[in-house]
Design a protein with these regions (language model features):
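Nucleotide-activated donor-binding/catalytic signature segment of Leloir-type glycosyltransferases, i.e.
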Residues: 18, 22-29, 34-61
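A conserved mid-protein helix/loop that constitutes part of the nucleotide-sugar donor-binding site
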Residues: 2-16, 35, 89
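Nucleotide-sugar-dependent
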Residues: 5, 56-63, 70-91, 96-109, ...
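C-terminal alpha-helical cap of glycosyltransferases
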Residues: 137, 155, 159-173
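Amphipathic alpha-helical segment in the mid-to-C-terminal domain
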Residues: 57, 125, 142, 155-163
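A short, well-ordered alpha-helix in the C-terminal region of glycosyltransferases
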Residues: 127, 134, 141-155
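A structural motif in glycosyltransferase catalytic domains
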Residues: 6, 10-13, 25, 128, ...
Length: 173
């Protein structure tokens, strides 16, 4: 939960969706923006937001299996600099992704190329709320996106495929 993450849009969306009992936000981890989230949740009385401390990577599957959709966020200007590694774990778990990121980022391109979720521009909490409501209203579409995410994880990002990509890169050198 660091500076590259657009947590502000997520907290704003949580405030808008506060009365929707079917939507809950879970932040796991620590980082530079965690205190800001804690303060915002307390000040705004966001009962639909939970914060947990960092957990062992072995526990990640439990949390991913408990969610319907996962949020991955990056502030503007991160394209070409960062792809959150959690994206690959989310894909492997077969979960659709709501990517809060610039439309030209690697994260956005992967989500759109695989049709495994939605892309929301950073700072656009209203669009995030709309996407969350769409996702909640379409469980079959969520399942299809999750299935595509899992297939992409297996066919493009599994260790054997990544290793082969590196090997072919070195063979060309």
């Amino acid at each position: 939960i660091g500076y590259p993450n657009d947590v502000e849009s997520i907290v704003e969306a949580a405030e808008t969706l506060l009365k929707d009992d079917n939507v809950h936000f879970l932040f796991i981890g620590s980082g530079a923006k965690r205190r800001w989230i804690e303060n915002s949740v307390e000040q705004k009385r966001l009962t639909n937001v939970s914060l947990l401390p960092s957990r062992p990577r072995d526990d990640q599957g439990n949390f991913l299996n408990a969610c319907d959709v996962a949020l991955v966020s990056l502030v503007s200007g991160m394209e070409g600099i960062s792809v959150p590694s959690r994206m690959y774990n989310i894909m492997a778990a077969g979960k659709p992704i709501i990517a809060i990121t610039d439309p030209q980022s690697e994260l956005a391109l992967a989500v759109e190329e695989e049709n495994m979720g939605w892309v929301v521009p950073p700072g656009n909490a209203d669009r995030l709320v709309t996407v969350i409501q769409e996702a909640r209203a379409e469980p079959l579409r969520l399942a299809e996106m999750g299935s595509r995410a899992r297939k992409a994880a297996e066919s493009k990002y599994a260790y054997v495929h990544v290793l082969q990509s590196y090997l072919s890169l070195f063979e060309k050198s």
